[in-house]
A protein has these predicted regions:
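Methionine-biased hydrophobic packing positions in alpha-helices, especially
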Residues: 37, 89, 144-145
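Conserved ATP-binding/catalytic segment of the ANL
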Residues: 129-131, 137-174
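Acidic/polar helix N-cap motif
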Residues: 15, 122-124, 151, 155
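Alpha-helix capping/helix-boundary segments
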Residues: 15, 37-38, 67
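Short coil-to-beta-strand transition motifs
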Residues: 112-115, 165
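Short beta->alpha connector loops at strand-helix junctions that form conserved
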Residues: 11-12
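Short, P/G- and charge-enriched loop/turn segments at secondary-structure junctions
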Residues: 102-109, 157-159
Length: 174
């Protein structure tokens, strides 16, 4: 967003009321959150929800931790279908994205890959069928071009013979 000339508002310390005040004051259109912030918003006095004009808010992106289904449902009920979730790592070996409507149809999902492919493998590197839990692996160009800084062994351990890479997370495809 910065490259496009957008203004960034960065709070020195997260505070629920300051976040709402900033959205109103600066007419924030896009924001980035973590699920813990949503939990804190929802624990606030419900009257706080109507004190601020959040109508400028068009896109609320969240990531960095799993978001409990009940929390995300409440946030969509409150803010509307502006929530977008992504799953990725700083290694940038892959990324998934899901919008509010897709998520409501597949609660708990983190979406589809934006590029490349997504695979669920067992401990032997065998692809698992839909619904079975295993290691999450990305395939494609970014999956094979990332590396851990000054750690060739760690980089090798994240790769498979098929050219897939993993952050070490587990999941399943639906």
């Amino acid at each position: 967003f910065l490259a496009s000339g957008a203004t960034s508002i960065i709070l020195e310390k997260f505070d629920e009321e300051m976040a709402f005040s900033s959205i109103e004051k600066y007419k924030v259109t896009h924001s980035q959150w973590v699920p813990t912030m949503f939990v804190r918003f929802l624990k606030e006095d419900p009257s706080l929800r109507t004190q601020y004009d959040l109508s400028s808010h068009q896109v609320a992106i969240h990531a960095a931790a799993p978001c409990p289904v009940a929390v995300k449902e409440q946030m969509i009920d409150w803010w509307g279908p502006i929530l977008h979730e992504y799953y990725a790592g700083t290694e940038y070996n892959g990324i998934t994205m899901i919008n509010s409507q897709e998520w409501l149809d597949h609660k708990g999902s983190v979406g589809r890959p934006l590029f490349g492919s997504l695979h669920i493998l067992d401990d032997d590197g065998v692809e698992l069928p839909i619904g079975e839990v295993g290691g999450v692996y990305f395939g494609g160009e970014t999956a094979t071009t990332f590396e851990y800084h000054n750690d060739e062994e760690k980089t090798k351990s994240a790769m498979t013979d098929q050219g897939y890479s993993s952050l070490g997370d587990v999941g399943y495809l639906d």
